[in-house]
């Protein structure tokens, strides 16, 4: 694409428009600037609310893929790619899953997390190449993330995933974007022009973060990774998470700290098993077997025990 064509294409994007509410932002005090930014940020949850049906549809597809041994792959460039890597990296400690279950890919590789890799996002073949490097298959789900909705790296990856017969989801902040047309499910929270023209790390990035949070959190809940609103599959790998596991057991069972710590020790730091053991009187082996029979759903395991 020529520079003239690119300039023309960008001029039609909502995310690249000039925001009439911030035209004088360079004249404001620090207090006034942050108030103006905050006013803009308030628009983001409403934009996400408008696409909740599409987000729920994506959650159903992701959950189904997980149950069949598939993975969730986030792929993007720049801020979009970094947000995908961030959400993916939080899943193992939060939900006790493998670090291969949710994977984030960014144009330019690991170095791009810290330093912009010029030109990487413009390479359409690189997206497909990065998917091939992780043995992407039809069992997996690809979420292509691009605020503009037109990043070649993401377009190439979505087209490759479609050719394999995988589920494809597009996350963009512009309506009727190229990636929305390619993907099977289009999630397009339109947040409007940015406070700083074209700086899509602002409202667009915030909207993307909210959507990604929903995709993994809702999918993991659907897999039984929570009991009530407690993270019962938390992986206690540091002092804070160990303390959190103790609190989770206490909150779920109304037991005292000493008993919660003893239960966690007996269950090998597995909060879900500790809770099941306390509430049903099962020993470790019995609780492990019952939880396996209930596909990891703690509530279901307790209900089946009561029958």
Curated annotation (Swiss-Prot):
<dbReference type="InterPro" id="IPR046348">
    <property type="entry name" value="SIS_dom_sf"/>
</dbReference>
<dbReference type="GO" id="GO:0016803">
    <property type="term" value="F:ether hydrolase activity"/>
</dbReference>
<comment type="similarity">
    <text>Belongs to the GCKR-like family. MurNAc-6-P etherase subfamily.</text>
</comment>
<protein>
    <recommendedName>
        <fullName>N-acetylmuramic acid 6-phosphate etherase 2</fullName>
        <ecNumber>4.2.1.126</ecNumber>
    </recommendedName>
</protein>
<dbReference type="InterPro" id="IPR001347">
    <property type="entry name" value="SIS_dom"/>
</dbReference>
<feature type="domain" description="SIS">
    <location>
        <begin position="62"/>
        <end position="225"/>
    </location>
</feature>
<keyword id="KW-0456">Lyase</keyword>
<dbReference type="GO" id="GO:0016835">
    <property type="term" value="F:carbon-oxygen lyase activity"/>
</dbReference>
<dbReference type="Pfam" id="PF20741">
    <property type="entry name" value="GKRP-like_C"/>
</dbReference>
<dbReference type="InterPro" id="IPR040190">
    <property type="entry name" value="MURQ/GCKR"/>
</dbReference>
<keyword id="KW-0119">Carbohydrate metabolism</keyword>
<comment type="pathway">
    <text>Amino-sugar metabolism; 1,6-anhydro-N-acetylmuramate degradation.</text>
</comment>
<dbReference type="InterPro" id="IPR005488">
    <property type="entry name" value="Etherase_MurQ"/>
</dbReference>
<dbReference type="GO" id="GO:0097367">
    <property type="term" value="F:carbohydrate derivative binding"/>
</dbReference>
<feature type="active site">
    <location>
        <position position="121"/>
    </location>
</feature>
<dbReference type="GO" id="GO:0009254">
    <property type="term" value="P:peptidoglycan turnover"/>
</dbReference>
<comment type="subunit">
    <text>Homodimer.</text>
</comment>
<comment type="pathway">
    <text>Amino-sugar metabolism; N-acetylmuramate degradation.</text>
</comment>
<dbReference type="InterPro" id="IPR005486">
    <property type="entry name" value="Glucokinase_regulatory_CS"/>
</dbReference>
<dbReference type="GO" id="GO:0097173">
    <property type="term" value="P:N-acetylmuramic acid catabolic process"/>
</dbReference>
<comment type="function">
    <text>Specifically catalyzes the cleavage of the D-lactyl ether substituent of MurNAc 6-phosphate, producing GlcNAc 6-phosphate and D-lactate. Together with AnmK, is also required for the utilization of anhydro-N-acetylmuramic acid (anhMurNAc) either imported from the medium or derived from its own cell wall murein, and thus plays a role in cell wall recycling.</text>
</comment>
<feature type="active site" description="Proton donor">
    <location>
        <position position="90"/>
    </location>
</feature>
<dbReference type="GO" id="GO:0097175">
    <property type="term" value="P:1,6-anhydro-N-acetyl-beta-muramic acid catabolic process"/>
</dbReference>
<dbReference type="Pfam" id="PF22645">
    <property type="entry name" value="GKRP_SIS_N"/>
</dbReference>
<dbReference type="GO" id="GO:0046348">
    <property type="term" value="P:amino sugar catabolic process"/>
</dbReference>
